[in-house]
């Protein structure tokens, strides 16, 4: 069985957001065994798997990414869409825009402390579209 659907994440402020529940609420029943791929159709945000318990991790991740890719650098040429746009593209490349997660016994087979992060790198990115592909039996 292969299923593919598009889902929408509601607009979020800049930062790292735990969205496991928001994604799962929009999905059909998962197969007993398989894989799920989640792909973000945008160039200034990303997806990641990281700790789901302590919200300080999300704050620290934002701090780290901002230090790795600062805004307002004179060497940036792509500046028409604002000071946060070119850094957002670079951060998206660093985090990636796709996740593949195993499905076991009809559930995402992630570690106890793992959750799906949506990483918004723009000050305001709007709603974001994800393509979800479920392969399983």
Identify the function of each model-found stretch:
Residues 1-137:
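Active-site histidine-anchored catalytic micro-motif
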């Amino acid at each position: 069985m292969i299923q593919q659907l598009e889902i929408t994440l509601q607009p979020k402020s800049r930062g790292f957001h735990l969205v496991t529940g928001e994604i799962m609420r929009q999905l059909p029943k998962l197969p007993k065994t398989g894989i799920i791929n989640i792909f973000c159709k945008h160039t200034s945000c990303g997806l990641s798997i990281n700790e789901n318990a302590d919200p300080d991790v999300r704050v620290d991740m934002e701090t780290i990414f901002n230090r790795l890719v600062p805004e307002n650098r004179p060497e940036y040429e792509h500046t028409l869409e604002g000071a946060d746009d070119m850094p957002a593209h670079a951060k998206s490349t660093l985090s990636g825009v796709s996740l593949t997660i195993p499905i076991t016994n009809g559930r995402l087979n992630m570690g106890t402390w793992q959750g799906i992060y949506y990483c918004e790198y723009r000050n305001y990115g709007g709603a974001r579209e994800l393509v979800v592909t479920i392969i399983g039996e």
